[in-house]
Amino acid sequence: MSNMPDQRRGPWSAGEDQRLIKLVKDLGPGNWVNVARILGTRTPKQCRERWHQNLKPGLNHGPMTQEEAAIIVREVDLKGPRWADIARKLQGRSDNAVKNYWNGLNNRKKNQLRRQSAPRRVSASDVLRSSPGQLPRAHMQRPIRYPQDIYTGSRRPSSPSSFNDSLHHRVHESIEWFPSRPQQQQQQQQQQARCTTPFTSFYPPSHAFPTTDGYQDGSDGPTGSTLRLLTPPTSRRLAPFSTLPSPTTSSIGDLDEFDRRQLAAFAPPAAYRRPSLPFPQQSSMGYLPSATEYLPTAPSSPIALIQRDEKNHARIPVTSLLCS
């Protein structure tokens, strides 16, 4: 046993085949132990199988004929996979060749059944060449895939009426998100009322705040026609100069020269006067009047202002007027 060569795996080379044929001719086809010992690269079993399956004279390596295929099918149905017995009934066929043919035949049958059971794919050329009544049966019997319903989780509706009802429900629900035009206008009016109510309650329209940062009609100094008067942000208006509180006549004599010049600076010349406008109407936006709606007509002099206003207004010091 120590002289037995190690088993070598893999395909046989051409040199090994030539040496095996020569050794079998010299030693005989039954002395496989000595053949393997002399060959030195294969075991006795490998040498025997190689000779009977591939190198034996008289073996037919061509394709199987129809008569041979029928014999193989009949013998396998009767006896099962007894490849050596089946090979003896065939002239020049080895048991390994019979086994390989049977396995290949089974694989071809399985692939054919798999192709027949699979649905046929219809190409664009087949559709153009055939009429609507001649379409393949597999294409006509393909089930329709409905989109999954997000409400019920099902893909196929139970009936056409239920499908129409669910569609109508989705459309009606989507329309409810968009309010009608009268409802939208009413919501805008309520929102405008909420925005303007706090300012109008705290700041009446007649209240004004004199500033000296700019003047109407592009004037560059205190000699401009009108003093810019600021109101709350919701309604920028120019209040008439006559609405300002009037100083008392007793306080006129207490004014020094500086106060008199300051008071006279607020009286524009008569050339820049403009006629008073009536009470402003609501603008197109509903609550933002134009800045030119209140254009005052100032008196010609501070003395005339005092004489006119002391009859109608409360008497307050002039210093409070200048400080405000």
UniProtKB/Swiss-Prot annotation:
InterPro entries: Homeodomain-like_sf, Myb_dom, MYB_TF, SANT/Myb. One of its GO terms (cellular component) is nucleus. Residues 166-175 have a biased composition (Basic and acidic residues). Keywords: DNA-binding, Nucleus, Repeat. Its main location: nucleus. Residues 107-231 are annotated as: Disordered. Residues 4-59, 60-110 form the HTH myb-type domain. The keyword DNA damage does not apply. GO terms for biological process: mitotic cell cycle; positive regulation of transcription by RNA polymerase II. This is Myb-like DNA-binding protein myb-1.
